[in-house]
Amino acid sequence: MYSVSNAWIKAHSGFLAPEGFVELSCYIPDLQETLVYTKSDLISFTHHQTGDLMSGELPKNYIEFSLDNSDGRWNPSNPKGLEQHLSERLRITLRYGFEINGTVSWIPGGVFYLSEWRTSLNGIAASFVARDVLEYCLDRPYTGSISGTLYDVAERAIGEAGILVDDTLGQFVLGESTLGGFVLGDGSPGTFKLCDALKRYSVENIEYDKNDSIAVILQKCANAAGCVMYQKRNGVFAIEKLRYTDTKYVIPMDLSYTYPEIEFMRPIKNVSVTYRDGKKLLYPFSGSGETQTLDNDFIATEAQAFEVAEWVCSNLRSRRNITGEFRSDTRLDLFDVVAVESKYGTISGVVLTDIKHTFTGAFRTTYSGYVRGSGVAVAVYCGEVFAGEVI
């Protein structure tokens, strides 16, 4: 969760909260100009983040928005229009604002790169999609070797994408590369940060699927080291251990549009880990339930497979997922640990794995999270719709 002032927290927690704001800025090299769009310019806006506690699926972080095109400024046939100056990977910076004591305070929302746009000749709106840096590693096949530590493999994969090491930052900087990489849009650097946990595990000369993309290689490294993948608000894409620090944040019923819904999944009886050369480890967890399977040839030894199985069980022991919708709080991030107020009590230890902020005249946030905490004494499925007006 992004840290803000006490005034921000106090203002947002009030039932009659001040107005929220969103701002998108994009530098256009052809024009040598930065285009800035605020809430008044947006017809619609969505910011969606998803992540997997097991790194079993690739994370996603993207924005979709539409702008007024009634004057034809985005028409492709307009010789003085803006569409001709668009190109893939233009850097778009997002920030969120909140009115406090008559002025707007801002916090970063993320860094994205233009991937799609649609500007019809006679349309009254132009729509755009921008995604995080990982998106540009999805269709680039990995051609290097799998040897050394997982850190070495991840570093090699990042290098193939054109990412250089900046030792002064301790991060990987995406820029011009002699390895056939690419530059993001305006030449601005994107950054990657790798956890030292990747240095604990070694892999040697593993045969892998030649169709595996750079993103998949990074995902396998994260999974084999018990790490998660996600992009931070400053544009840094991280592979690191999840610390599950409780933010002490509560999603209150007063600001919710619906009662939260709890989904119960079958408990885990054991975890089956398939590791290098097709070897298997069966890790018992409880007396009944289903078998959770994990297949990763980057897991090199039985000891490592045992650690991964323990990690899976510690994350998935609750087998409860919660979803809801409430008045937006743009401080919330992927993998934040929060509490959710329900009709019958407060559900604690909820790790957010899917969070979406939308604006179509007013802000809303929908969320999904995995319950790692004790939850409520009596778990109840609540499907009734809150009928009151939430401002």
Regions found by a protein language model. Give the residues of each.
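Charged- and aromatic-enriched interaction segments used to assemble
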Residues: 103-106, 118-263
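Detector for glycine-centered tight turns/loop "hinges" at secondary-structure junctions
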Residues: 31-32, 102, 234-235, 278, ...
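Acidic, low-complexity/disordered segments
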Residues: 1-13, 19, 128-130, 137-145, ...
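Short secondary-structure boundary/capping segments within folded domains
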Residues: 35, 52-58, 287-296, 302, ...
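Stable alpha-helical structural segments in soluble proteins, enriched in small hydrophobic residues
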Residues: 303-317
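Short beta-strands and strand-coil junctions in structured, solvent-facing domains, enriched
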Residues: 227-228, 309, 358
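Broad, structure-driven detector of short, well-ordered beta-strand segments within folded domains
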Residues: 228-231, 270-275
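Assembly/oligomerization scaffold segments
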Residues: 1-148, 156, 178, 182, ...
